[in-house]
């Protein structure tokens, strides 16, 4: 819950890792839009996005017939994605390692979020991130609700965050 995040830097919390699933990713992104340049707050060093609906949710607000260019830029952007473009002005340059995990059950998405919507994160932050990597989880483990309940996600997430 981002509402319980510290509002000022304390000696106990100087560095921060964030992990979001589904709409939790929007909380991370809007936190960075609103506070990404605030040096009084803990420094974000690692960000994990799981099943991020950056350019919409299937059947709700995802544009039809979206294509991504090589940089992850969607050919059509929904209203939320256009607001997320502001993160390009506030995201700390060469500071944050980013891991983007998404699912594909065989139909181009995880049942709630398309691969294209999840992969559109690349356009938002890969140019300023310290590193950016993507992992696709295929098959039944790639279902939206399963993505936070499988070792196919847990293992690379733990290795990314803690090097274990």
Residues of each region from the PLM?
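Phosphate/oxyanion-binding active-site loops and adjacent basic polyanion-contact surfaces
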Residues: 4, 23-24, 149-153
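Soluble periplasmic/extracytoplasmic beta-strand elements of cell-envelope proteins
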Residues: 17-19, 102
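Gly/Ser-rich "nucleophile elbow"/oxyanion-hole loop immediately N-terminal to the catalytic nucleophile
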Residues: 9-17
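Short, small-residue-biased leader/transition segments that mark boundaries at the very start
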Residues: 2-10
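Gly/Ala-rich beta-loop-alpha elbow adjacent to hydrolase catalytic centers
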Residues: 19-28
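Helical cap/lid subdomain of alpha/beta-hydrolase-fold lipid enzymes
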Residues: 32-164
């Amino acid at each position: 819950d981002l509402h319980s995040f510290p509002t000022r830097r304390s000696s106990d919390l100087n560095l921060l890792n964030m992990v979001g699933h589904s709409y939790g990713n929007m909380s991370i992104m809007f936190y960075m839009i609103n506070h990404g340049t605030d040096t009084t707050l803990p420094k974000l060093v690692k960000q994990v996005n799981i099943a991020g609906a950056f350019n919409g949710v299937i059947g709700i607000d995802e544009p039809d017939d979206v294509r991504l260019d090589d940089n992850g830029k969607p050919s059509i952007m929904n209203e939320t994605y256009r607001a997320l473009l502001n993160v390009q002005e506030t995201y700390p340059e060469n500071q944050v390692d980013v891991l983007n995990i998404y699912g594909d059950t065989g139909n181009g998405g995880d049942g709630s979020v398309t691969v294209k919507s999840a992969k559109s994160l690349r356009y938002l932050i890969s140019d300023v991130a310290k590193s950016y990597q993507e992992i696709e989880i295929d098959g039944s483990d790639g279902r939206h609700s399963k993505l936070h309940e499988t070792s196919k996600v847990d293992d690379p997430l733990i290795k990314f965050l803690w090097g274990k």
